[in-house]
A protein has these predicted regions:
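Dinucleotide-binding Rossmann-like beta1-alpha1 core, especially the glycine-rich loop
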Residues: 1-51, 214
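Helix-loop-beta segment of a Rossmann-like dinucleotide-binding subdomain
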Residues: 2-11, 43-89, 94, 110-112, ...
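General small-molecule cofactor/ligand-binding pocket signal
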Residues: 36-38, 91-93, 281-285
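Mid-domain beta-loop-alpha active-site segment that forms a flexible
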Residues: 63-84, 129-132, 259, 263-267, ...
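Active-site beta-strand termini and strand-to-loop segments that position acidic
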Residues: 66, 115, 219-221, 302-305
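Conserved positions in beta-strands of structured domains
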Residues: 99-102, 302
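Flavin-dependent oxidoreductases
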Residues: 101-255, 276-278
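C-terminal catalytic lobe of FAD-dependent flavoproteins
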Residues: 234, 238-243, 252-330
Length: 330
């Protein structure tokens, strides 16, 4: 019902990421999650070329290959979750906007939610609003700034509680079905993080040098092309001035910057020889979205105002279903 494609996921890294990825691998082993961890430049290169013979990325010293991960279609997956929720007894009201939270007399607990279509009384409220979490945080009169404890025990000055980051994503106009590994399987989702020098495949200019950069790509049968993206960039506006709507592809304000096309296509050529010159197949179209993040970029899953549980995470995808499951148990 979710149309998930378990093609696998590969986290491919330089030495700076090795320790963190090794820890992730050991955590996966503890819970029985099927993955392989390859260490050392020579073994990594051999492993990748056995899968993708034209692999040529330099400076790679570890590969975490998650066998059961993958990707799926955004809209169809959401409709699938809707069916599962309704089958479990949930009632979903679409096109409704929450406008205010009403607190009980003499208590900080929320007793009702005012919406564009009436008031809904509640004994427990769960807020899982993605980039709109800022709005509910304000409704709950929670602090707009925080002080962060540093490693030396001192605290920073007041830092805004919320800020936004914008995704940079794009696609190549190619037939995704034509891409297969040496084993005849679909490509896994490929994610690379490295500080190796990245040179423009189009101009020869240096894009990244002596700094960490990353991106991902995958042949996507739902988008009919190769889809991918790179690290999000900071939105410089204060959170309360950011226009979240219209969101995603409908937004004119938050779109990939001009330099993204060159970085994305050059990074693909950095990884695989066959993508040399692939900038000619880059789709000129709108893409992306924005995420709301905390000062340390870590998510918040916690109880507030006695009976309000907030899931504040800029991530997305199937892993959030796992978060929802854990929150429902709690």
């Amino acid at each position: 019902v979710l149309q998930f494609r378990p093609v696998g996921y590969m986290q491919i890294n330089s030495q700076l990421m090795h320790e963190g990825m090794a820890e992730v691998y050991h955590q996966q082993k503890e819970i029985g999650y099927d993955s392989t961890f390859i260490e050392g430049a020579a073994d990594c290169d051999k492993y990748m070329k056995e899968l993708l013979p034209d692999w040529q990325a330099q400076g790679i010293t570890s590969v975490l290959h998650e066998k059961n991960s993958g990707y799926g279609p955004n809209r169809e997956a959401n409709l699938g979750f809707k069916k599962l929720a309704e089958a479990a007894g949930a009632k979903i009201l679409e096109g409704v906007q929450a406008t205010n939270l009403i607190t009980a007399n003499g208590s900080g607990a929320v007793s009702a939610v005012e919406t564009s279509q009436g008031t809904i009384e509640c004994s427990q409220l769960v807020v899982a609003a993605g980039p709109w979490v800022r709005t509910f945080w304000e409704m709950l009169d929670l602090p707009n700034s925080v002080k962060i404890k540093q490693p030396d025990g001192t605290f920073t000055d007041e830092i805004p509680m919320w800020s936004y980051m914008a995704l940079e994503e794009g696609e190549l106009d190619v037939d995704p079905h034509s891409y297969r590994t040496a084993k005849g399987t679909e490509y896994p989702v490929i994610h690379v993080d490295t500080e190796s020098t990245l040179v423009s495949n189009k101009t020869g200019d240096v894009i990244h040098e002596n700094e960490m950069w990353g991106f991902y790509y995958k042949p996507d049968v739902y988008r009919n092309g190769i889809q991918g993206g790179s690290s999000p960039y900071d939105v410089t506006k204060p959170a309360n001035e950011v226009n979240i709507d219209p969101y995603g592809h409908k937004s004119d304000e938050f779109q990939p910057r001009a330099a993204f096309e060159d970085k994305f296509t050059s990074a693909m050529a950095f990884c695989q020889k066959q993508f040399d010159g692939c900038h000619a197949k880059y789709k000129k179209q709108k893409a992306g979205g924005i995420g709301c993040v905390t000062p340390d970029r870590f998510p918040v899953f916690d109880q507030y105002r006695e009976n309000v549980y907030i899931i504040a995470d800029a991530n997305h995808g199937y892993k959030m279903a796992g978060v929802g499951d854990l929150v429902s148990d709690e």
